[in-house]
Amino acid sequence: MGNPVVIVGSGLAGYAVARELRKLNAEIPIVMISADHGGFYSKPMLSNALSTGRTPESILNGDAVQMASQLKIIIRPHCRVVAIDEPGYAVTLVDGEKIFYDRLVLALGADQVRLPLLGDGIEKILTINDLD
């Protein structure tokens, strides 16, 4: 087989792409690169878990090992892509490693907007965007 489909991001979109690709082709190599632990969970459940006192782990539907096994993909947790070489069909990780791809999917997700707030209650404002 040739180079894999590389998916950058392990959120809902990244896992949806991996699942759909797997439905289309059981043999295509897929590598998922995740800046975090690489487990699968519903991001909207983060605020629910926080408000009900549940642990972050309680909303995890599968860790990276389980998800890799289930989808028959390679998951590279705690890796960051720092460069994309389009003509060379490669991504470079923060440690300098290059991963070559046949197709590249950027499923980077969203970050919360931090408002420039002032005042006495500023320390009581929480933002939550991932399990960490």
Locate predicted features.
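FAD-binding core/adjacent interface of flavoenzyme oxidoreductases
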Residues: 1-6, 61-132
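Beta1-alpha1 glycine-rich phosphate/pyrophosphate-binding loop at the start
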Residues: 2-74
